Amino acid sequence: MSDNNGTPEPQVETTSVFRADLLKEMESSTGTAPASTGAENLPAGSALLVVKRGPNAGARFLLDQPTTTAGRHPESDIFLDDVTVSRRHAEFRINEGEFEVVDVGSLNGTYVNREPRNAQVMQTGDEIQIGKFRLVFLAGPAE
């Protein structure tokens, strides 16, 4: 209740972010993916992006559609809310069973394993940087 004459206060929307043990393992690993990443539980032909660094560290995004968009636009499949991210920054595409990240004309570019890339087929453990966000790619079992 509020003190403003019986009018209820507007509810504030909140988001909770839970950090996964995976992130800690990846930080301390010596370049190899941890033995158990949770990717083995993914549906066949899908993959997972885990935010390693950025305002929503620990968030996970399932890649199970032919094209998944990432950017600062509110209608992006992966909404990355920061000025370092373009409105329409990158797309994650499935091509013949392989996952590819494609920069779609962003201002700051898209990086895979700290190298600038316009397009790159991803492998499990690859780090994708979009603005100040760093995401780790984990592939599920092949179809």
UniProtKB/Swiss-Prot annotation:
InterPro entries in alphabetical order: Cell_Proc_Reg/RNA_Proc, FHA_dom, OxygluDhInhib_OdhI, SMAD_FHA_dom_sf
Q: Name one GO cellular component term.
A: cytoplasm
* Domain named FHA: residues: 68-117
Endpoints of the signal sequence: none
Give the highest taxon in the source lineage. Bacteria
Family annotation (Pfam families): FHA
Q: Which UniProt keywords apply?
A: Cytoplasm, Phosphoprotein
Which cellular compartments is it found in? Cytoplasm
Location of Phosphothreonine modifications:
14
Q: What does this protein do?
A: An essential component of the PknG signaling pathway. When unphosphorylated, it inhibits the activity of 2-oxoglutarate dehydrogenase. When phosphorylated it does not inhibit 2-oxoglutarate dehydrogenase.
Full protein name = Oxoglutarate dehydrogenase inhibitor
- Please state the gene responsible for encoding this protein: odhI
